[in-house]
């Protein structure tokens, strides 16, 4: 599965408040935990900067379909601007660069 960094920005304070009302409810009733880990998707971390109206997530997904399924409802309901970047782990950096360095000799 591929790692993705999601940078999410609320468009305004009104939508941020509405989204957090839903998030608090979903967190407390277990919906977030259920949707954060499936066979093809896993939320590894989610951090909040509410003063900036921003949430940053690191997730692992089988494909862009799982990214869409997880994040699209939040975007559709609250107009959250989302940017997704495929990223790699430290071990991947080491492995990939070892291969690269072999070709540069």
Segments predicted by a language model, with ranges:
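Short S/T/G/P-rich N-terminal loop/turn motif that feeds into the first structured element of a domain
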Residues: 1-53, 62-69, 88-105
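Conserved short beta-strand edge segments in small beta-sheet-based binding/regulatory domains
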Residues: 78-89
């Amino acid at each position: 599965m591929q790692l993705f960094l999601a940078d999410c920005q609320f468009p305004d304070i009104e939508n941020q408040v509405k989204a957090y009302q839903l998030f608090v409810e979903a967190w407390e009733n277990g919906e977030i935990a259920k949707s954060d880990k499936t066979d093809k998707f896993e939320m590894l971390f989610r951090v909040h900067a509410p003063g900036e109206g921003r949430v940053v997530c690191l997730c692992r997904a089988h494909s862009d379909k799982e990214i869409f399924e997880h994040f699209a409802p939040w975007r559709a309901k609250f107009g959250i601007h989302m940017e997704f970047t495929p990223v790699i782990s430290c071990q991947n950096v080491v492995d990939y660069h070892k291969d690269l360095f072999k070709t540069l000799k």
